[in-house]
Amino acid sequence: MQFQQLTYFVAVAEARHFTRAAEEVHVSQPSLSQQIRALENELGAELFSRARGNITLTDAGEALLPLARRILADADTARHEVQELAQLRRGRVRLGATPSVCTGLLPEVLRAFHDLHPGIQLLLEEGGSHDLVRELARGALDLALVVLPLPAASPALTTVELLQEDLVVVSSAQRPRPGRGGRVRIADLEGEPLVMFRHGYDLRELTVAACRAEGFEPSFTVEGGEMDAVLGFVRAGLGIAVVPHMVAARSGADLRATPLARPGLRRTIALAHRSDVAPPRAARELQRVVLGPV
């Protein structure tokens, strides 16, 4: 049974005339009759009574007509839905990003994407790179903005480096600036009260590793927060924190950012997706927008 045969059948049923039905569907009358006969043979029943030139539906034809209309309507709906997705008028993208990227980079990128494709729904998951890599691996995300290098046990992922960002030390504007000469050495953090991110957070691991490389264990006054919480605790004067420059630049006048002395700390942000699964069309378009300036 073919969609074309059902289309011809519905046309004849509505016109009650083979020639007029053939004109309606833009096919020759013999071809239409041949397809109707093939459909009847496949179903094992006559669909039309052709007595004395009058075309009427048989019981089998009456039973098939509403089903055929529904099948054709569903096919048309499916065709429209697929075309909408293919032309990026509808769809969704599941994007993961670290909190600092959500704060610093994504607002402008997502605004640009939304302006281009307002019908595409953006589902954002915020988390550390370890969590995002795990979500990519199980198919819960289409794309993720992660920090390189990836965890050693990461599944096969394709990554494209997006940017490198410097880390800075943020402190309350009400307390003395840390360090000397307008810059902070990692060694200057020894004994300083640090507001620290939760375990599994890339910035925590990077900061702790840098302190240990200088021969000391960092001292935490508060630990376990996400980006917004950490900045809030710093504003309240509970300590200082090491954060990306793009976050500090947007944190307001009540926070003061001090650069780290050379060589400083930097991290690389990359856009990742699974290597074994091609991202959906909408995700590929977001990928193009994200990587546009690269």
PLM region spans:
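Hydrophobic hinge/microswitch elements
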Residues: 128-141, 147, 198-258
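Conserved amphipathic alpha-helical core elements
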Residues: 39-40, 113
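A short LG(V/I)-centered, amphipathic sequence patch enriched
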Residues: 40-57, 62
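A late-sequence structural motif
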Residues: 105, 256-294
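Acidic, Gly/Pro-rich loop/turn segments at junctions of secondary structure
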Residues: 116, 127-191, 246-252, 264
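Short helix-boundary/capping micro-motifs
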Residues: 12-31
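Secondary-structure junction motif
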Residues: 147, 177-185, 193-214, 279-287, ...
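Central regulatory/effector-binding core of bacterial HTH transcription factors
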Residues: 90-153, 224
